[in-house]
Amino acid sequence: KGDKTNVIVVSIPDYAYTPFGQGNSGVSTEIDFYNAYAKNYCEQNDITFVNITDITRQGLINTDLVASDGLHPSSLAYSFFVERILPLAINKLSD
């Protein structure tokens, strides 16, 4: 089996904050439930967890965070994801 110290778990983006999702609070609630479970699991098992959901929840206010399909994160959103994930990945790869 692999070494869990090399794993980074990323939260689920919230597509309710896109034109496709139309602010559906039920979707956000389910995503919060799953992300809380994943974060808790990671904390209990010493696995790195990165929250990117808050970035995607700005999608209805900042439409530049949503791709032209009205559903997926844009390249700008992904650049913010990378800002959070890359330093952790570099650290893990350098160990």
List PLM regions with ranges.
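A short helix->loop->beta-strand "cap" motif at the edges of active sites that frequently abuts
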Residues: 1-6
